[in-house]
From Swiss-Prot:
Pfam families: YcgL (PF05166). Gene3D superfamilies: YcgL domain. It comes from the Bacteria. Signal peptide: none annotated. Residues 3-87 form the YcgL domain. It comes from Stutzerimonas stutzeri (strain A1501). This is YcgL domain-containing protein PST_1364.
Length: 97
């Protein structure tokens, strides 16, 4: 199976991507998912084959999901619980003026 895939990134959540068949674009993606995802921003396009390696996803799962439901949703990697998120103003305290 060979598929030209459009990959969209979410403006709402870093690391969240939506893989779709380029021919169908976003037609098969449920409205509720699009509403939660935000306005999709085209990140890039790839030719997907079972032999291709993806950085964070199983290629066979991606291809199966696109064929069965019209899309594959890549969730952001889980953050470690011990990481504390600091306010932006604290992160800039040592920046030169």
């Amino acid at each position: 199976m060979k598929l030209i895939c459009s990959i969209y990134k979410s403006p709402r959540k870093d690391g969240m991507y939506l893989y779709v068949d380029k021919r169908d674009a976003l037609k098969r993606v449920p409205e509720g998912l699009l509403a939660a995802f935000g306005a999709p921003q085209l990140a890039f396009e790839l030719v997907l084959t079972p032999e291709r390696q993806l950085a964070r996803e199983d290629i066979n799962k991606v291809l199966a999901n696109i064929e069965a439901q019209g899309y594959h949703l890549q969730m952001p990697p889980a953050e470690d619980e011990y990481i504390e998120h600091l306010p932006e103003e604290l992160l800039r305290m040592n920046d030169p003026m």
